[in-house]
C-alpha cells in the first residue's frame, strides 16, 4: 500500500510539476487570444475602415516591384525593335546600295541587313530588315529615309512589326504577280505602281511616260506580250508556206490568179499572227493582216506584198520581173505585143545560132557575150513578164550554161583559142576573169542596166578589133 502511495505521490508530484510548467490558465488565455484575434478582424471590417488603408498600401509596393520587370521586358523589346523594314525598292538593289543610302542620312551603326528573298529562285522581294545599334538611329531612319530614292524608286520605311511585315509581304506578292508573266525583265518595284498595275490592266501602257520612266519603260513596252511569249516561236512558222513560189512563177503571167493562190496558202497563219500585232484588234481580218508589218509595207497589202515576199525568196529575175509586172498588161496592145514578141524571137534565134557557131570555133567568150546581150535585150522589153518571153530567156540561159561548161572543160588547152587570145592581146586569165564577170553580172539583177551598157561598149570594141584584124 505504501509503495502504491509513493507511486501516487510521485505521479502527483509530476502532475503538479506539469501544471507548474504548463499552466492551464495560460493555455486557456492563449487560446482565448487566438480566438479573439480571429474574431476581431471580422468585427473590425464591419465596424471600422481603418485596417483597409494598410491593405491598400501594400499593393502599392507591388507595382514598384513589378516596374523593374516591365522595364526589363520593354528594354528587351527595345533591343529587338532597334530595327526597321525598308521596302518598295527594286529586286536588283544590292546591300551596298542600301547601306550607302542609309549612311547618307547620318546612320552609321547598321548591325545587320536581311533581305527578304523568294524561296523558289532566291530573288529579292523588294524589302529588307535593317538592324541598328541604337534607338536614335531607328528614329532617324523613320524620319529621314522615306524621302530617299533608290534605283529610281522612293524608299518606304516602317517599324519592324508583324503588321508592317505582312504589308511588305503583300506588296511583294503583287509585284511578283506583275513580274511573273514578263520573265526576267526588271519589274516596276514601286508599291503604288505595282498596285495600280494589279488593279487595272491598262496602267502599264499609261505609265510609259510618267516619272521614273527609265525604270518603268522596259516593262511598259511589253504589256501586250503577257500572253504571247509562249507563242512567240510561232513567228517562225509563216516562212513554211513560202515553198509555193514555184506555182507562182508558173502562173506569173496572169495577174488575177496569184492573189487567190497567196490567200489560200497563207490562210493558216492568220489565227496565229494577230496576237503578235498586239495593238490592232484581230476582229475582221482582211487578207492584208496575215503579213507582219515589220517586214512588209502595209500600203501594198492587197496584192503587192505577197508577190514581193515570194520574189525576194526566189531568184533576182523574178524579183526584177515583179517590178515590171504592173505596166505591161495595161500599156501594151495586141499588135504591139505581137511585134515585140516577133523581134524577141528573132534576137533569141540569131543569138543562139551565133553563139553555137562561135563556141564550135573555140571563141567561147564571144559566144557567152552574145547570149548575155540577147538575154539583156529581151528582159528589157515591155513584154518581158510574159510566159513566152520567159521561155525564150530560159532557152538562152540553157545555151549559155552549156557553152560555159564546155569552155571550162576545154580550158586553156585549145591551141586555136590561145592563138585567138594572143592575136587579140588577151591572156587566158583575162578570159576567165571576163567569163566570171559575165556570170556574176548575170546573177546580179540590180546592176543589169550598167552591165548592158558595158557589154554594148565592149561588143563594139570587139567588132572594131575583129574588123582591123581581118583588114
From Swiss-Prot:
Region (Disordered): 34-68, 176-220, 409-471
List of residues that carry Phosphoserine: 205, 413, 423
Subcellular localization: Nucleus; Cytoplasm
A Pfam match: RRM_1
Keywords from the UniProt entry: Cytoplasm, Isopeptide bond, mRNA processing, Nucleus, Phosphoprotein, RNA-binding, Ubl conjugation
Function: Component of the cleavage factor Im (CFIm) complex that functions as an activator of the pre-mRNA 3'-end cleavage and polyadenylation processing required for the maturation of pre-mRNA into functional mRNAs. CFIm contributes to the recruitment of multiprotein complexes on specific sequences on the pre-mRNA 3'-end, so called cleavage and polyadenylation signals (pA signals). Most pre-mRNAs contain multiple pA signals, resulting in alternative cleavage and polyadenylation (APA) producing mRNAs with variable 3'-end formation.
Similarity section: Belongs to the RRM CPSF6/7 family.
Protein's recorded name: Cleavage and polyadenylation specificity factor subunit 7
Organism: Mus musculus (Mouse)
Amino acid at each position: 500500500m505504501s509503495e502504491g502511495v509513493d507511486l501516487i505521490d510521485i505521479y502527483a508530484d509530476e502532475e503538479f510539476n506539469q501544471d507548474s510548467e504548463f499552466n492551464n490558465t495560460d493555455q486557456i488565455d492563449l487560446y482565448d487570444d487566438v480566438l479573439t484575434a480571429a474574431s476581431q478582424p471580422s468585427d473590425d471590417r464591419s465596424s471600422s475602415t481603418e485596417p483597409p488603408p494598410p491593405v491598400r498600401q501594400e499593393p502599392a509596393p507591388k507595382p514598384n516591384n513589378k516596374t523593374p520587370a516591365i522595364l526589363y521586358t520593354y528594354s528587351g523589346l527595345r533591343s529587338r525593335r532597334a530595327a526597321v523594314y525598308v521596302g518598295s525598292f527594286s529586286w536588283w538593289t544590292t546591300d551596298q546600295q542600301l547601306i550607302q543610302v542609309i549612311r547618307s542620312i547620318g546612320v552609321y551603326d547598321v548591325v545587320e541587313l536581311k533581305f527578304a528573298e523568294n524561296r523558289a529562285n532566291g530573288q529579292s522581294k523588294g524589302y529588307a530588315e535593317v538592324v541598328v545599334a541604337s534607338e536614335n538611329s531607328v528614329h532617324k531612319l523613320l524620319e529621314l529615309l522615306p524621302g530617299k530614292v533608290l534605283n529610281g524608286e522612293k524608299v518606304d520605311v516602317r517599324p519592324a512589326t508583324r503588321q508592317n511585315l505582312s504589308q511588305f509581304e503583300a506588296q511583294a506578292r503583287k509585284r511578283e504577280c506583275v513580274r511573273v508573266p514578263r520573265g526576267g525583265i526588271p519589274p516596276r518595284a514601286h508599291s503604288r505602281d505595282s498596285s495600280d498595275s494589279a488593279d487595272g490592266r491598262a496602267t502599264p501602257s499609261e505609265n510609259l511616260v510618267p516619272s521614273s520612266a527609265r525604270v518603268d519603260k522596259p516593262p511598259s513596252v511589253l504589256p501586250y506580250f503577257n500572253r504571247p511569249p509562249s507563242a512567240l516561236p510561232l513567228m517562225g512558222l509563216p516562212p513554211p508556206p513560202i515553198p509555193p513560189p514555184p506555182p507562182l512563177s508558173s502562173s506569173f503571167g496572169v495577174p488575177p490568179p496569184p492573189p487567190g493562190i497567196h490567200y489560200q496558202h497563207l490562210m493558216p497563219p492568220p489565227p496565229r499572227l494577230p496576237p503578235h500585232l498586239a495593238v490592232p484588234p484581230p476582229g475582221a481580218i482582211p487578207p492584208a493582216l496575215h503579213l507582219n508589218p515589220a517586214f512588209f509595207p502595209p500600203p501594198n497589202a492587197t496584192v503587192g506584198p505577197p508577190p514581193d515576199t515570194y520574189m525576194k525568196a526566189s531568184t533576182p529575175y523574178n524579183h526584177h520581173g515583179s517590178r515590171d509586172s504592173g505596166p505591161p498588161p495595161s500599156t501594151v496592145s495586141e499588135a504591139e505585143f505581137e511585134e515585140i514578141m516577133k523581134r524577141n524571137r528573132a534576137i533569141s534565134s540569131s543569138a543562139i545560132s551565133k553563139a553555137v557557131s562561135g563556141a564550135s570555133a573555140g571563141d567561147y567568150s564571144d559566144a557567152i557575150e552574145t547570149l548575155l546581150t540577147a538575154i539583156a535585150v529581151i528582159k528589157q522589153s515591155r513584154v518581158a513578164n510574159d510566159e513566152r518571153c520567159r521561155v525564150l530567156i530560159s532557152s538562152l540561159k540553157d545555151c549559155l550554161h552549156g557553152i560555159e561548161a564546155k569552155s571550162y572543160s576545154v580550158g586553156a588547152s585549145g591551141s586555136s583559142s590561145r592563138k585567138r587570145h594572143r592575136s587579140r592581146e588577151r591572156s587566158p586569165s583575162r578570159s576567165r576573169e571576163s567569163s566570171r564577170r559575165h556570170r556574176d553580172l548575170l546573177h546580179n539583177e540590180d546592176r543589169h542596166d550598167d552591165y548592158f551598157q558595158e557589154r554594148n561598149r565592149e561588143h563594139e570594141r570587139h567588132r572594131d578589133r575583129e574588123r582591123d584584124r581581118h583588114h
